[in-house]
Structures are given as structure tokens and as C-alpha cells.
Design a protein with these regions (language model features):
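N-terminal Sec-pathway targeting helices
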Residues: 2-10
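Hydrophobic membrane-insertion alpha-helices, especially the h-region
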Residues: 9-21
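Bacterial Sec-dependent signal peptides at the C-terminal "C-region" and cleavage site
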Residues: 18-30
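Local sequence-structure signature of Cys/Sec-based thiol-disulfide redox active-site neighborhoods
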Residues: 28-65
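Thioredoxin-like thiol-disulfide oxidoreductase module
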Residues: 70-95, 101-105, 123-127
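Thiol-/selenol-based redox modules, centered on thioredoxin-like
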Residues: 115-129
Length: 129
């Protein structure tokens, strides 16, 4: 009885170790950025509109030249259906928001409301954008 418990615990520990360390080993393969989705509002009240207008400037400054091809801009005010796909899938609650996605649509990074040029540029560099 004691021996079988030890075997079970040893097997369980081995399985847990593989589960814990396998993602760390795989994390050396950094996912590649395929698309950046920017969800904003052109019609909103007060501070929401101000945040979105500021976000528009930041996104415009960061996504220029070759980087512009990565960006998909979705305006909730004029294209609710397209925005709702992302809102539902990624459980978004604030605007403006940037979504960094890989080729399979997996979320790599997100940033909402207070968009910062340096932080976004750093994340672009990290994911190869």
C-alpha cells in the first residue's frame, strides 16, 4: 500500500514537472506577430473620446511605414459588427485597445486606454513587428 502510494506520487510529480517545464522550454520559440488590431471610437462622450483621440495619435505615430501593413483599425462607432467579434473573443471592456495577434488569432499582448508609444514599440520589437 505504501509502495503503491510512492509510485503514484512519483508518477504524479513527474507529470507535473513535465507540465511545468515544457512551456518554459517552448517559450524560447517566441510567437510571431501577424496582425495588430486597434479598436477605437470616433463618437463617444467626454473622457472616452479624449482617450480614443489620444490613442489615434499614438497609433498613427507608431504604425507608419512598413508597420502600417500590420495594423487593422476598427471603429466601434461606425463598424459595430466587426468590433464585436474582437470584443467578444477577447472580452474587451475599454477603448481604445490594441491587440497583438499571432497568425492563429491568439492574443500575444494587449494594451487598453493609456497607449504609450515606447511601450508599443518595445512590444513590436519583442514580437518581430
Amino acid at each position: 500500500m505504501v509502495k503503491s502510494r510512492r509510485i503514484i506520487l512519483t508518477v504524479l510529480a513527474a507529470v507535473m514537472a513535465v507540465g511545468i517545464y515544457a512551456p518554459i522550454a517552448a517559450s524560447g520559440d517566441q510567437p510571431k506577430l501577424a496582425q495588430v488590431v486597434y479598436i477605437t471610437l470616433t463618437k463617444a462622450c467626454g473622457c472616452a473620446l479624449t482617450a480614443c483621440q489620444a490613442g489615434d495619435i499614438v497609433v498613427g505615430n507608431v504604425f507608419n511605414g512598413a508597420r502600417k501593413a500590420l495594423l487593422k483599425r476598427v471603429d466601434y462607432s461606425t463598424n459595430k459588427e466587426a468590433a464585436k467579434v474582437y470584443i467578444k473573443k477577447y472580452r474587451l471592456t475599454q477603448a481604445p485597445v490594441l491587440l497583438f495577434l499571432d497568425a492563429k488569432g491568439n492574443l500575444l499582448w494587449t494594451k487598453a486606454v493609456d497607449l504609450d508609444e515606447k511601450e508599443i514599440a518595445d512590444q513590436l520589437s519583442q514580437f518581430g513587428g
